[in-house]
Amino acid sequence: MASCTLLAVLVFLCAIVSCFSDNPIDSCWRGDANWDQNRMKLADCAVGFGSSAMGGKGGAFYTVTSSDDDPVNPAPGTLRYGATRERSLWIIFSKNLNIKLNMPLYIAGNKTIDGRGAEVHIGNGGPCLFMRTVSHVILHGLNIHGCNTSVSGNVLISEASGVVPVHAQDGDAITMRNVTDVWIDHNSLSDSSDGLVDVTLASTGVTISNNHFFNHHKVMLLGHSDIYSDDKSMKVTVAFNQFGPNAGQRMPRARYGLIHVANNNYDPWSIYAIGGSSNPTILSEGNSFTAPNDSDKKEVTRRVGCESPSTCANWVWRSTQDSFNNGAYFVSSGKNEGTNIYNNNEAFKVENGSAAPQLTKNAGVLTCILSKPCS
């Protein structure tokens, strides 16, 4: 009887491990049934350009107990209170919460917002998450949807910066401006007024991984504008994400910078999958692209601002080990840079694109129950 029980446990664990055995992020932590007692282990698991993001590791735990939101004088127990503290904090949630913010939530540096163990929804018709000139932020396990525009008004930016007037915002789910060392992992994002993720204004050292992007037209913008050349320093890794169903374009759309797009799974798009302007370097590796049935929309790529084919001929857009389905195709250009772009701490193994559907099958928010591995 005991041997049968042990066998059942082993089969169960093997079934879990098989879901992420080749995903280097998930294999770092998801097999731990005691994840709740070792939450900060997560900070050791990022890969790519955002692998140095420590979030609130080494700091205290802060527990969100209330969905209330006061943009100017947040109460202890609310998400805004924890997010705006100056010290390192690992923010967790005591219960399931639906949070409708009254103004964008400015997240101070050295913060992890960790939704594991609760069902956390942010948005719900209000504005959403904002980072400006901060470092070391991790967002994990959040449902972010229904993000709306905000009006101008006063907001507590952080304890140090105090309350300041801010302009109206466009309704992005996650906005990053001039940030470094940020990791966005295992979130589910959809249905917002503008984009789901914006990384702009010389942000760099960002990894966007294991997220599920769906039911949204303009998904991800990397780079502020065609005249903002400071984004040449931008380095972003986009890996192990599920795009779709019903994701239209900008997965991502880049300006300047170096973008590594690896082992993502793309459902059919409505316009294009990967695009850009202003000579970004885009290295597409090990992705699975399934084109829409529309014969005019089979191309994965879209180049913007090319007055003639020669204008963009030197842009480095390369496809390696990608898998193409239903007539999808990638138009490469520029010299072959290879993918030796990382230092030892950032590098990770990229599988062939045929493996991307399996690697991304658990993208988005996971179910995390005490004493069981997250699934």
Curated annotation (Swiss-Prot):
Superkingdom of origin organism: Eukaryota
Disulfide feature: C28-C45, C128-C147, C306-C312
Enzyme Commission code(s) on record: 4.2.2.2
Keywords per UniProt: Allergen, Calcium, Disulfide bond, Glycoprotein, Lyase, Metal-binding, Signal
One GO MF term: pectate lyase activity
InterPro entries found in the cross-reference section: AmbAllergen, Pec_lyase, Pectin_lyas_fold, Pectin_lyase_fold/virulence, PEL
GO BP of this protein: pectin catabolic process
Catalytic activity: Eliminative cleavage of (1->4)-alpha-D-galacturonan to give oligosaccharides with 4-deoxy-alpha-D-galact-4-enuronosyl groups at their non-reducing ends
Cofactor(s), by name: Ca(2+)
Residues modified by glycosylation: N110, N148, N178, N293, N352
Class of enzymatic activity (EC top level): lyase
Entry-linked Pfam families: Pectate_lyase_4
Physiological role: Has pectate lyase activity.
Entry protein name: Pectate lyase 1
Organism of origin: Chamaecyparis obtusa (Hinoki false-cypress)
